Amino acid sequence: MKPSVDYISGESLYRPEVVRWRRRIEERYIPPEDAAVAVLLPCSATKPYSASPSHRRFIAAIKRGAKGKRSLVHEAIMTSPLALVPRELENLYPACCYDTTVTGHWSEEEKEVLAKAIRSYAAKFKGELLCYAGEAYAEVCESLGIDVIAKDNLLSEDSLKALEERIREALMDKQGTGYNPLEPLRKVADVQFGLGAGKALICEGARVRRGRIFYKGEQVAAISERHGYLALTLRGGELLRDFSGYVVELSFFPKSNNIFTPGIEHAGEDIRPGDEVIVVYGDEVVGVGKALLNGSELAKAERGLGVVLRHRRKAA
């Protein structure tokens, strides 16, 4: 069962997981390099967004317009307080499971937070940006010079036809590329562990079967049904060790799955409680699991449980 969280006040903009989401999208997320056009869409009450009736119709119109060039269209969802949710990250916490009050009115602070996120996205995106949304969404996009396809009656046949035609026009002289199912997972890894983690963990030739990721016949990670992030195996930890700030260094070889803080010599500063971490002893990855404290606390605390391992290397 997925966790749920309510964002019902202005203070929600500053909740730790919300600020962390916006920062990670700004610092760790790169839009698909081969996309020629991006459509900024409104959020929906149903999560993930793609399961909502409105987004199903948006997606259908985009597909009709793109035809065989669907991989050239990227989608991002505008929302408060998270600001921007790339479509391929909609199953990640907290985007996958939040509720917010829908009033149609946004504060100036909310608008500026969204505008900042869109500016950051636009600076990294090589193609054309379009907006298919009304109310505050359209106001923000217009202030940034983004073409707004429709503001009202977004589910009307006329509006959806306008979206379809605008996509077709944007892709008219573009060459389609094939869809790579590994790319969305690489984006997840980048956001979770840092830029570069996606290609390091999910190599060309990797395969995905029933939510598990394999490379050369060996499992490297699994996709969590609860929060959408990746749970590593020992092999996955080895692939990511040099590309991640989520490493915990021990002064001993662990003989149990419970790692107490006195035995921790160093921990990455980006680590927060609940994060997936790679545990090393010397030059060897000896475990992967969940941090219970942040990086500074893991390194400095003199007592208490710091990490719970999911996979542990057995002593030779």
Model-derived features: positions:
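Active-site and ligand/interface coordination hotspots across diverse enzymes
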Residues: M1-I59
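Short connector loops at secondary-structure junctions
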Residues: K69-C96
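Anionic-ligand-binding alpha/beta catalytic cores of soluble enzymes and soluble regulatory domains
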Residues: E164-S244
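Beta-strand/loop-dominated core regions that host nucleotide or nucleotide-derived cofactor-binding catalytic loops
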Residues: V220-A316
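Short acidic, S/G/P-rich loop/turn micro-motifs used as interaction or catalytic elements
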Residues: A45-S50, L82-P86, T101-E109, E135-E139
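Extended, charge-rich low-complexity interaction segments
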Residues: A95-E128, M172-C203
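Glycine/proline-rich loop-helix segments at beta-alpha junctions forming the active-site rim
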Residues: K111-N180
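Well-ordered, non-membrane alpha-helical segments in soluble/globular domains
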Residues: V19-R22, A51-G65, T103-S120, L160-L163
